[in-house]
Curated annotation (Swiss-Prot):
Belongs to the universal ribosomal protein uL5 family. GO terms for molecular function: rRNA binding; structural constituent of ribosome; tRNA binding. It comes from Pseudoalteromonas translucida (strain TAC 125). GO terms for biological process: translation. HAMAP family: Ribosomal_uL5_B. Part of the 50S ribosomal subunit; part of the 5S rRNA/L5/L18/L25 subcomplex. Contacts the 5S rRNA and the P site tRNA. Forms a bridge to the 30S subunit in the 70S ribosome. This is Large ribosomal subunit protein uL5. Coiled coil: none annotated.
Amino acid sequence: MAKLHEVYKDKVVAELQEKFGFSSVMQVPLIEKITLNMGVGEALADKKILDNAVADLAAISGQKPLITKARKSVAGFKVREGYPIGCKVTLRGERMWDFFERLVSIAIPRIRDFRGVSAKSFDGRGNYSMGVREQIIFPEIDYDKVDRVRGMDITITTSAKSDEEGRALLEAFNFPFKK
């Protein structure tokens, strides 16, 4: 079992239950899933770029990514409906906890000129989204084998009812918000 999952069960639940006055343990927010999305617009010109992005995302997440396709045609971007333009992975359960632990303890501190993540990126329902400009912050990516630096979106979906609850949940895991 991931260390952060045990921390959640042992400390975070009691802490949040006391802070928000929840009558039941089941009311305490938890992380439901983490979604990693990599948009690869350059894949229109070269299919190998998408294959490399899929390989990177598979190495980071530990599971095979789903290739996302364009929903509609956009002439300005030279995109037709059904063209592969990215990839995504939805992590749940133990893989999610393992990834979250690596994200908080290893990957985020490796970001260049890091001063904390924005606390304004909540969606109003307690879910948090952040962007990463370089996939090389993850230890699974071999720097020498990277063909080009790609970014990705990371969305942490929680069962929190408000941004305040979501932020308290992530802060309990020492998520590095800007002060």
